[in-house]
Amino acid sequence: MNAPPTFESFLLYEGEKKIIKELDTKVTNAAIFTINKEDHTLGNMIRNQLLKDPNVLFAGYKVPHPLEHKFVIRIQTTADYSPQEAFMNAITDLLAELSLFEERFKDAIKEKKEGGD
């Protein structure tokens, strides 16, 4: 089979970076971030979070190849807001939302167990 070993989907090799940033020279105030060892799940979540930000003009992602465990996200922002700032804010907001979701989920499970329904 051509499929890479399973561990390659989540283990970073020695010297491999989780996130690589490069400036987009074709568009002003834009950057391209490559996130290694992740897939559509995180890519779509980050893109959706970025699109909630009014200072983000464009946010899109792609997985270059189905056998490569990485995605590339392109972000363009307004002149007074950097793509890196937008990326960091989106991740921070996403972590807060997921934390709230986890808390509510645990509360719902606890309530269900106590209620006996």
UniProtKB/Swiss-Prot annotation:
Signal sequence interval, chain numbering: none
Coiled-coil regions, chain positions: none
InterPro entries attached to this UniProt entry: RBP11, RBP11-like, RBP11-like_dimer, RNA_pol_Rpb11_13-16kDa_CS, Rpo11-like
Cited SUPFAM superfamilies: RBP11-like subunits of RNA polymerase
Nucleus as UniProt keyword: yes
GO MF terms, alphabetically ordered: DNA binding; DNA-directed RNA polymerase activity; protein dimerization activity
Entry GO CC: RNA polymerase II, core complex
Domain of life: Eukaryota
Cellular compartment(s): Nucleus
Keyword set, alphabetical order: DNA-directed RNA polymerase, Nucleus, Transcription
Pfam families (alphabetical): RNA_pol_L_2
Entry-linked Gene3D superfamilies: RNA polymerase, RBP11-like subunit
Swiss-Prot/TrEMBL GO biological process terms: transcription by RNA polymerase II
Keyword match Secreted: no
Assembly and binders: Component of the RNA polymerase II (Pol II) complex consisting of 12 subunits.
Family: Belongs to the archaeal Rpo11/eukaryotic RPB11/RPC19 RNA polymerase subunit family.
PANTHER family: DNA-DIRECTED RNA POLYMERASE I,II,III, DNA-DIRECTED RNA POLYMERASE II SUBUNIT RPB11
Function comment: DNA-dependent RNA polymerase catalyzes the transcription of DNA into RNA using the four ribonucleoside triphosphates as substrates. Component of RNA polymerase II which synthesizes mRNA precursors and many functional non-coding RNAs. Pol II is the central component of the basal RNA polymerase II transcription machinery. It is composed of mobile elements that move relative to each other. RPB11 is part of the core element with the central large cleft.
Protein name: DNA-directed RNA polymerase II subunit RPB11
Organism (species): Drosophila melanogaster (Fruit fly)
Lineage: Eukaryota, Metazoa, Ecdysozoa, Arthropoda, Hexapoda
